[in-house]
A protein has these predicted regions:
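Conserved alpha-helical scaffold flanking the Walker A/P-loop in AAA+ ATPase domains
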Residues: 1-3, 57-63, 68-96, 129
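The Walker A (P-loop) glycine that initiates the GxxxxGKT/S ATP-binding motif of P-loop NTPases
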Residues: 14, 78, 100
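Walker A/P-loop
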Residues: 10-54, 118
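Basic, amphipathic alpha-helical bundle interface domains used for macromolecular binding and assembly
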Residues: 83, 107-225
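Walker B catalytic acidic pair
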Residues: 93, 99-101, 111
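Catalytic P-loop NTPase motifs of RecA-like helicase/translocase cores
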Residues: 98-105, 148
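Peripheral, non-AAA+ core regions of ATP-driven protein-machinery
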Residues: 1-10, 124
C-alpha cells in the first residue's frame, strides 16, 4: 500500500515459493486508474512502438511490463539504429516487474539508473538524440542467494559466503539506492497460505491508496512536485 500510494520502487527478497511474484502481480490491481492525460501519453508510446492492440483508442489500465532476465539492454531501456522505446518506457505510468533481478546483465541493471533518477531515457546516436518518458514503479524480486534458500527455515542453504557475496554484488550500490523500499519476504508453507482467510481484498487496498493520493494532492497543492 505504501509503495502504491507514493509511487515507490520496491525490492522483494525471499526464497522460492515465498510469494514474491504473487505480491508483485497484485500491486497493479491496487493502483489508481490512469488520468486522461496519462492515458494519452502512455498510448502514444505504445502506438509508435507497435504495442497498441488493434481497435484500442486509449490505454484503459496502467501498463505492466515483465521482461525476462535474458532481455538485452536495448530491449530494456530502448535503443537500436533507429531508436525505439524499451520496456522502461512501455511501463510509463505503470509497473515494471523484474523477476530474478540479479540475473539481468550488469549493463542492463546499470542502464536503469537514469530512468529511475530522471523518469526519462536518453538515447544518443550519431545523427540524433532521442528522449523517451519513463516514469514507472519498479518492482524487483530476487532470491537471497544463488540456491535461493539462505533465509528459508524449511530447507538448508548450499551456498558458501563467497558465493552469496558474489551473487548480491551483481546489484550495485547506486542502483540499490534508487529503490526506496526493500522487503524481506519469508518462506511460508503452502498449508499456512491456504489457511489464511482474513486477508484484505485488493478493492479495499485500492480505496486506501486512492485516499492517500488524494491527501497528497491537497498537501502539495500549488507546489511544483
Amino acid at each position: 500500500i505504501i509503495a502504491a500510494s507514493g509511487g515507490h520502487n520496491v525490492l522483494l527478497i525471499g526464497p522460492p515459493g515465498s510469494g514474491k511474484t504473487m505480491l508483485a502481480k497484485r500491486l497493479p490491481t491496487i493502483l489508481p486508474p490512469l488520468t486522461l492525460e496519462e492515458s494519452v501519453e502512455a498510448t502514444r508510446i505504445h502506438s509508435v512502438s507497435g504495442e497498441l492492440q488493434p481497435g484500442m483508442a486509449l490505454l484503459a489500465r496502467r501498463p505492466v511490463r515483465s521482461p525476462h532476465h535474458s532481455a538485452s539492454t536495448p530491449a530494456l531501456v530502448g535503443g537500436g539504429s533507429i531508436p525505439q522505446a524499451g520496456e522502461v518506457s512501455l511501463a510509463h505510468y505503470g509497473v515494471l516487474f523484474l523477476d530474478e533481478f540479479p540475473e539481468f546483465t550488469r549493463s542492463s541493471l546499470e542502464a536503469l539508473r537514469q530512468p529511475l533518477e530522471d523518469a526519462r531515457v536518453t538515447i544518443a546516436r550519431a545523427h540524433a538524440t532521442v528522449s523517451f518518458p519513463a516514469s514507472f514503479t519498479l518492482v524487483a524480486a530476487m532470491n537471497p542467494c544463488p540456491c535461493g534458500y539462505y533465509t528459508d527455515p524449511r530447507r538448508p542453504c548450499k551456498c558458501t559466503p563467497l558465493q552469496i557475496d558474489k551473487y548480491l554484488s551483481r546489484i550495485s550500490g547506486p542502483l540499490l539506492d534508487r529503490i526506496d523500499i526493500h522487503i524481506e519476504v519469508p518462506g511460508v508453507p503452502f498449508s499456512a497460505l491456504r489457511s489464511q482467510t482474513d486477508g484484505t481484498p485488493s478493492s479495499a487496498m485500492r480505496e486506501q491508496v486512492l485516499a492517500a493520493r488524494d491527501r497528497q494532492r491537497h498537501r502539495f497543492d500549488g507546489n511544483p512536485i
